[in-house]
Amino acid sequence: MTAGPTDPTPTSQIRNFSIIAHVDHGKSTLADRILEQLGAMGERDKRDQTLDTLELERERGITIKSTPIRLEYTRENGEGYVFNLIDTPGHVDFNYEVSRSLAACEGVLLLVDASQGVEAQTIVNAYLAIDNNLEIVPVINKIDLPAADPEGAARELEEVIGIPAEDAVRASGKTGIGIPEILEAVVERIPPPAGDPGAPLKALIFDSFFDAYQGVILFVRVLEGTMKAKDGVRLMNAGKNFEVDKVGTFSPGLVVGQELSAGMVGWVAAGIKDIQDAQVGDTLTGSDRQTAEPFPGFKPAQPVVFSGLYPTDTEDYRKLRDALEKLKLNDAAFSFEPETSEALGFGFRCGFLGLLHAEIIQERLEREYDLDLIATAPAVVYRVTLTNGEIFETQNPAEFPTRDRIEKVEEPYIKLSVMLPEDYVGPVMQLLQERRGSMQTMNYVGKRVELVYEVPFAEILYDFHDRLKSISRGYASMDYEQLGYREGDLRKVDIMVNNEVIDALAVIVHESKTYSLGRKIVDKMAEVIPRQMFPVPVQAVIGAKIIARATVKAYRKDVLAKCYGGDISRKKKLLEKQKKGRARMKQFGTVEVPQEAFLAVLSTEE
């Protein structure tokens, strides 16, 4: 950490803005050019995607975490301005991160790829910005591409979102064309922040991360008042008081400053030790002079996909719990609670925003915390009434009682609303019908349609979000609310490998789908289970009735096994490689079931 500038900039000279775009429209590259133009990147810092701080982000070429940075800009007439640029993720899974970052800004640069035109996320992001009353500066990016059609892209912007085509700045993040015009547009078009530095403190937490030495570091946008070291502050949602240790700005690292006042974006360290206290979207206020009301409109993100995560080595359970708690701090949209499995031992049931989110969390756990994990099929909480009148709830298919003991089974239903362009209504309605949905209403909003369905929650858990996106080419967006429980004709399908039931692979499914799902699972499992010296039967069963079977054929005997000679170090290397592969597996009786088998259950819809 370094010491930063001490004199507070007048709010009229501050501009807080964000860059939003569809995935792959060149947002991080454009941010790099802006940083370069304003001298925020030294020669040694020059690398692509400067604001993408996670190694995983640069590898996949996507932005996952929102990263802020403070920049200084001087106009030709000598006027100095402070820009706070808050980089946001572009993938649909991370919409929550985008909405929080936008709440900290007064305006946005809306990027559109000149060769692709307006895409789904462009529209979603533009509406997010409009909902937050932000000034939109449209930028047609990648005009240097051979396939670029900047005029067409500008026209689309006007037709779809209603932004006048002549307002769009033409630019190229790669070559740096148009960057000076963008910087001028930020000063001219984006309003300075409002707010009274003398009012009681009111600051919005839009992100946070855990630092081993200072505890939780909060990323805040100060809306009213002033905050400096030694001030008493209160987290309004958590209802807890703390003393500020340090405040500062970003450049892109943390730079210690004297104070943060109305209009500024910065960070606060206040010795907050408990991860759960630092909820993103909470309001920070003075402990003695409190603001009248917290920042409105923040709701915690609702996870869409649920899955169990188990360490392959049971001794890593505590390490996994600590890692999940730390990740939760950096990712408000992720939830988890403990669960157990006979086959896999102790683990956690985790909630994610989508499959990319789930994949990234699992990858981060494995990389950053050096854990080996197995992920199970997603499920919901079922309510079972037994023949003796007893009622209990379970989300673990392994705990499901036998058919003869069940009076009735109830499953959670949701009210699902889907917004989509009218061209895709047919295929989306068909998808909802396949998922046992019943249609409630259908409303036309301009050229878009809102479908409202009542659907069993379990039906949207597997891959519904992804199927919806692919059917609608990414244009459909969904939201849901819980409706409570309803009776359903549900069955538990067990999977047996070599005549042994594997509890972690059990699924609960509607009677109408038992055969097709059982068939898909056993066929997929037979592909991924390694061949043994003997044939291995893989069966799907309901109670004692076998509904589907596949066989993993036996190896023929390896006649080369008795060969001598060969390089010993080569043999060692192969043995070592095999050992690593085995660590990813759990032993069930005599047959090893690899991680792919658990994933096969997840991807049966493909």
Swiss-Prot record:
GO biological process annotation, one example: positive regulation of translation
Keyword entries, A-Z: Cell membrane, GTP-binding, Hydrolase, Membrane, Nucleotide-binding, Protein biosynthesis
Membrane topology (UniProt): Peripheral membrane protein
Pfam families, A to Z: EFG_C, EFG_III, GTP_EFTU, GTP_EFTU_D2, LepA_C
Catalytic activity of the protein: GTP + H2O = GDP + phosphate + H(+)
Binding site for GTP: D24, H25, G26, K27, S28, T29, N141, K142, I143, D144
SUPFAM superfamilies assigned to the protein according to its UniProt record, in alphabetical order: EF-G C-terminal domain-like (SSF54980), P-loop containing nucleoside triphosphate hydrolases (SSF52540), Translation proteins (SSF50447)
GO cellular component: plasma membrane
GO molecular function: GTP binding; GTPase activity; ribosome binding; translation elongation factor activity
Gene3D superfamilies: 3.30.70.240, Elongation factor 4, C-terminal domain, Elongation Factor G (Translational Gtpase), domain 3, P-loop containing nucleotide triphosphate hydrolases, Translation factors
EC number(s) given by UniProt: 3.6.5.n1
Enzyme class, UniProt record, top EC level: hydrolase
tr-type G domain residues: 12-194
Principal subcellular localization: membrane
Compartments it resides in: Cell membrane
Function, in words: Required for accurate and efficient protein synthesis under certain stress conditions. May act as a fidelity factor of the translation reaction, by catalyzing a one-codon backward translocation of tRNAs on improperly translocated ribosomes. Back-translocation proceeds from a post-translocation (POST) complex to a pre-translocation (PRE) complex, thus giving elongation factor G a second chance to translocate the tRNAs correctly. Binds to ribosomes in a GTP-dependent manner.
Protein family membership: Belongs to the TRAFAC class translation factor GTPase superfamily. Classic translation factor GTPase family. LepA subfamily.
Name listed for the protein in its UniProt record: Elongation factor 4
Source organism of this protein record: Deinococcus radiodurans (strain ATCC 13939 / DSM 20539 / JCM 16871 / CCUG 27074 / LMG 4051 / NBRC 15346 / NCIMB 9279 / VKM B-1422 / R1)
